C-alpha cells in the first residue's frame, strides 16, 4: 500500500496510524503526526502544504487529548481544514488514525 499518491498537483496521504498501540491518545497522536511530517518530508514538502486532515478517533472521549497535541503541532498561521469523527478503527488499541490531502511540493 502506498503512503501517499500524487495526482497532478494534489497528494493524498494514506491513513497514518500509530505503531505503539500501548500509548495513550497523546502518544498515539504525536506518533501519527510525526508520520504525517515524515511522509510530507519524503515528498519534499511540509505540513504547510497540507490542505485538509481527517482525524478518526475510536473514542470521542479522546478528543481533548488529541486536540492538545494537534494544537502544539499545527502552524496557527497556516492551519489545514480538519474534520474529526468517531469510528471503529481496524486494530484493537488503536485510538487515532489520520488521512490528509496536500498540495504537491514543486
Where are the regions that the model predicts?
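Short, polar/acidic, helix-capping and beta-turn segments at strand->helix junctions
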Residues: 1-106
Amino acid at each position: 500500500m502506498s503512503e501517499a499518491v500524487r495526482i497532478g498537483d494534489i497528494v493524498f496521504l494514506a491513513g497514518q496510524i500509530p505503531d505503539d498501540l500501548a500509548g495513550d491518545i497523546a502518544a498515539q497522536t504525536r506518533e501519527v503526526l510525526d508520520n504525517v511530517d515524515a511522509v510530507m518530508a519524503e515528498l519534499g514538502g511540509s505540513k504547510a502544504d497540507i490542505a485538509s486532515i481527517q482525524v478518526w478517533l475510536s473514542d470521542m472521549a479522546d478528543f481533548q487529548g488529541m486536540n492538545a497535541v494537534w494544537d502544539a503541532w499545527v502552524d496557527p498561521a497556516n492551519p489545514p481544514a480538519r474534520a474529526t469523527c468517531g469510528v471503529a478503527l481496524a486494530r484493537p488499541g488503536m485510538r487515532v488514525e489520520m488521512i490528509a490531502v496536500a498540495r504537491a511540493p514543486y
